[in-house]
A protein has these predicted regions:
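Mature extracytoplasmic/periplasmic domains
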Residues: 102-111, 269-273, 301-378, 398
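Conserved C-terminal helix/tail region of periplasmic/extracytoplasmic solute-binding proteins
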Residues: 25-27, 78, 155, 361-399
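Hinge/lid segment of periplasmic solute-binding proteins
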Residues: 91-145, 169, 195-197, 282-286, ...
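Extracytoplasmic "Venus flytrap"/periplasmic binding protein-like
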Residues: 24, 29, 46, 50-122, ...
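A structural signal for short loop-to-beta-strand junctions that line the ligand-binding cleft
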Residues: 75-76, 83-84, 113-152, 181-182, ...
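Extracytoplasmic/periplasmic substrate-recognition and gating elements
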Residues: 25, 49, 54, 79, ...
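Extracytoplasmic/periplasmic solute-binding protein
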Residues: 130-139, 145, 169-218, 261
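Glycine-centered hinge/linker elements that transmit conformational signals in sensory
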Residues: 172-175, 214-245
Length: 399
């Protein structure tokens, strides 16, 4: 059966990139990533299964934490022992590696398969292109703009599910009085910054956000709406439990899944945790993009392929890149991950109600919101995140 699946799968791949597999035979690939939660492991296994169904071996190197995984990749490259592929975010995180000539160009497979014709939205091409060549594979679109809601908690308390951050602030005291934690948070810097971004986009809208993150417009910072955003963000502290510091994001999601907490503000990767727990969208949990104007932020993940002294590795890397953008694999992976596929010709019939919301929005160019990582260096992003974290945790930090 496995041999048959391998043959059928190979037929779905472009002809120009099935020949390398046949000529090279069995291919072994080590992949570094940071997908370690239950939902994330279910998703990465879709890539691994597709690779192994082609008759190859997938060596899984999962490292907890994006910073740790990226650091390991860079150290391995510098040390002369690079992995076959490694995960990064849709961002400028890997630009230095491209400029230093450390990454394999994927232009050969990108041109042969017409990536520029099907990758959507086109902004993703901009992320991966350098001097007219592809150096990464975008595998999904993740949006940070979500509130995840335990429906049963809201029904028991007798308050409506909020549509905006302010509406949540209005009902949170009653949730607290009923003995539930209103807002589940993992008190890590990146989670705090993500929550601030959701509060800001809900309060300010994307045009104002672009003035802040892209243009560094001083007037946008001095605007009264930005001050309101800061006050609202800090006000959420009243509804977060004392166990938040250091909590992992998926542990915070579990609090909502289990009915200990009412809401989590987190990216759509949280959907994978609900799915693994057997929960159904709009039945057991709800998903809300807070704000009167709905945006879907353009985040997500890419894989890069470090250069290797062994010339055979390039063939393996091009095969893997091709596999990752295959429409069937894209459907399986993103349905498990909670993310949106990076092409529109994917079968989304299995999409749940929350995924469908994202699919509807991503087709509207005016609803797509670029993230800070797209415009700023990792150094700027880290400094910004640290300031936001200090502001949330230090009551003496004035607006």
């Amino acid at each position: 059966m496995k041999k048959l699946i391998s043959i059928l799968f190979s037929l779905m791949l472009p002809l120009s990139f099935t020949s390398a597999s046949k000529a090279g035979g069995h291919m072994e690939a080590e992949v570094i990533h940071w997908w370690t939660s239950g939902g994330e492991q279910a998703a990465i296994s879709k890539f691994a299964e597709a690779w192994e169904d082609m008759g190859n071996t997938w060596i899984d190197t999962a490292i907890t934490g994006g910073d740790n995984a990226r650091g390991t990749t860079v150290n391995r490259i510098i040390g002369g022992n690079p992995p076959t592929a490694a995960q990064f975010n849709i961002s400028k995180q890997f630009v230095d590696l491209v400029e230093q000539g450390q990454l394999q160009s994927l232009e050969e497979v990108a041109s042969a398969e017409g990536w520029r014709d099907f990758i959507y939205p086109p902004d993703l091409i901009e992320t991966c292109e350098y001097n007219g060549e592809f150096y990464c594979v975008p595998v999904n679109i993740h949006s940070s703009q979500w509130m995840w809601v335990n429906i049963d908690v809201f029904e028991k308390v007798g308050v409506p599910i909020p549509n905006t951050i302010q509406e949540f602030v209005d009902v949170a005291p009653k949730i607290q009085e009923a003995g539930y934690i209103p807002l589940a948070l993992g008190g890590q810097t990146w989670q705090e910054s993500l929550m601030f971004g959701v509060v800001a986009s809900s309060t300010l809208g994307f045009p104002h956000m672009a003035k802040l993150y892209r243009d560094k417009d001083v007037d946008a910072f001095r605007d009264g709406k930005f001050e309101l955003t800061l006050h609202t963000y800090r006000d959420l502290n009243r509804f977060i439990d004392e166990g938040a510091p250091g909590r992992l994001w998926n542990d915070a999601t579990a609090m909502v899944v289990e009915g200990k907490a009412a809401v989590q503000i987190m990216g759509d990767w949280a959907r994978g945790e609900f799915a693994v727990a057997g929960k159904e969208a709009k039945v057991d949990y709800d998903c809300v993009i807070p704000g009167n104007v709905k945006y879907v932020s353009l985040g997500g993940d890419v894989f890069v392929f470090p250069k290797n002294s062994d010339p055979k590795v390039k063939d393996i890397q091009l095969q893997m890149a091709s596999m990752m953008v295959n429409p069937t694999v894209q459907a399986d992976f993103n349905n498990a991950k909670g993310s949106l596929p990076m092409r529109l010709d994917v079968d989304t019939s299995a999409a749940d109600a929350c995924m469908q919301m994202g699919l509807d929005l991503i087709k509207q160019p005016e609803a797509i919101m670029r993230e800070s990582d797209d415009w700023n260096s990792p150094a700027f992003t880290n400094a910004w995140d640290d300031i936001i974290s200090e502001f949330r945790n230090d009551p003496n930090y004035s607006v």
